[in-house]
């Protein structure tokens, strides 16, 4: 038995990231006040409710303890576009996890094309087959946490004609979702 209070935050993260799997990846697109596009992946992300349609994503801080650009942008604009990551975008998505200066756009730096779908929201990554256009519903204050959970309400959803299966996170690796297993029937 492992007592969590005896572990460091890094050990807790490793334990949770290894065994709470697979974790979907929210490839979040935001814009700052000047319209600069920020794109970053987050795997502490999950559906939360269908009424209202919402997800939760936990966003950490930079090494200097200031909010990551994604968090700062969502706090200011109250909006985010979450793209699900198809396998063909894995490398660019992974590159976009690199910390850049706030005045540098991941879209430009890593050559990630975007396309505007809804004027009042950040653009989506061009070529992804599923995107959620969200508004900030609630920021959760977890006392002592190094991450900030955000509840984002889904206002619009884009689904391509032939949506691709998104990749997921398993530990520190990525995974393609494979064969679907049929659920056993329940006795009456």
What is the role of each PLM region?
Residues 1-188:
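Basic, polyanion-binding surface patches
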